[in-house]
Amino acid sequence: MAKPEGGAEPKVASPERVAAFRTGISAESRAAAYLMAKGYRILAKRYRTPHGEIDIVARRRNLIAFVEVKARASLDDAAYAVTPRQQQRIIDAAQGWLAAHPEHAEFELRFDAMLIAPRSLPRHVLAAFDAST
């Protein structure tokens, strides 16, 4: 089998990494459906910037919610998974999203978390963190 140009072998994700990716995609889909049922409009999913990624950007009336989705074995485990470092990356990414979407700059902004666990309804944590922390 020929090697790709440059001689490097292509990276192959471990089965654990593939499973985590699929779990994340499924959790984000559940979270988006839950938000839509609550009257939010999804503006972006998996929005990437050089600073980080925002799982979901959602709007309801004059509010923009930047939502971090966490899927774990329990809702409590999911709640502890949003670390201060991740919070700062999401805040930085949100600034990038707002720069790319200046029409939303005057909206109220909020940083939420959506906690997902098997056999549980999603838990939407409003204002889970803010840009001043």
Swiss-Prot record:
Any one GO molecular function term: nucleic acid binding
Pfam families noted in UniProt: UPF0102 (PF02021)
Gene3D superfamilies reported in the protein's UniProt record: 3.40.1350.10
Domain of life assignment: Bacteria
InterPro entries linked: Restrct_endonuc-II-like, tRNA_endonuc-like_dom_sf, UPF0102_YraN-like
CDD domains: PoNe_Nuclease
Family: Belongs to the UPF0102 family.
Protein name: UPF0102 protein bll0669
Taxonomic placement: Bacteria, Pseudomonadati, Pseudomonadota, Alphaproteobacteria, Hyphomicrobiales
